């Protein structure tokens, strides 16, 4: 219908790429966990009073839709590797949650997928950083090819932001995050699963690197559901 009426039709990623030119963009990529991680990042930025614009592929938790338009300088966007669309985006900083053999109708094999994530990460400007999960074997294999500042997180001992002392209270995670061995304190989630501990840790790492306090991140994580 739009084409019949001569209204331009463009892909989601291309539109996001244009929006990113006008904002300081935080881009969340990875095979799994993108929507949740994007939503937690958004919750932290809102708790910090930064009124971000948030765009996810699913529904923004607590918003009832796939987008929330804010008046602040930040755009927080889920970035999908499907059909290589995330290569149209211009992130200021990014998270890569994991890399898995998915969308093999678009990619030849896992090596092709890893190549795309390297291209994505290397689009980040010199003043940004890419936050990556050191627990993921495929992420580990691309680290040497990343030319931009890399910040690691995970349960792995070598991670800059390391999860420690994980336990579950009434089925929900309670854990400590260490930044270069120094404790940021205890964090609690209202969403279950070890995978969500990693998603939250990625969001906290990005927040700290962008100058948001651990206390603000802690409060946002505790209230996120």
Locate each region found by the language model:
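Adenine nucleotide phosphate-binding catalytic loops in nucleotide-utilizing enzymes
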Residues: 101, 107-114, 128-129, 144-225
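Phosphate-binding loop of NTP-binding sites
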Residues: 1-134, 138-149, 201, 210
């Amino acid at each position: 219908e739009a084409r019949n009426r001569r209204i331009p039709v463009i892909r989601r990623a291309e539109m996001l790429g244009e929006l990113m030119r006008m904002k300081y963009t935080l881009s969340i990529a990875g095979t799994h966990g993108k929507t949740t991680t994007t939503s937690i990042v958004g919750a932290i930025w809102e708790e910090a009073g930064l009124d971000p614009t948030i765009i996810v592929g699913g529904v923004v938790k607590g918003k009832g839709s796939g987008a929330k338009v804010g008046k602040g300088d930040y755009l927080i966007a889920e970035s999908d590797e499907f059909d290589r669309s995330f290569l149209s985006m211009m992130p200021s900083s990014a998270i890569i949650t994991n890399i898995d053999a998915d969308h093999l109708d678009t990619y030849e094999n896992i090596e092709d997928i890893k190549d795309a994530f390297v291209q994505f990460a290397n689009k980040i400007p010199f003043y940004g950083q890419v936050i990556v999960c050191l627990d993921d074997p495929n992420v580990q294999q691309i680290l040497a090819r990343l030319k931009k500042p890399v910040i690691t997180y995970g349960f792995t001992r070598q991670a800059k932001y390391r999860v420690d002392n994980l336990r579950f209270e009434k089925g929900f995670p309670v854990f400590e995050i260490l930044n270069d061995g120094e404790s940021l304190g205890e964090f609690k989630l209202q969403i279950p699963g070890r995978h969500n501990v990693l998603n939250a840790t990625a969001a906290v790492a990005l927040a700290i690197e962008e100058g948001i306090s651990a206390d603000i991140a802690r409060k946002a994580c505790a209230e996120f559901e």
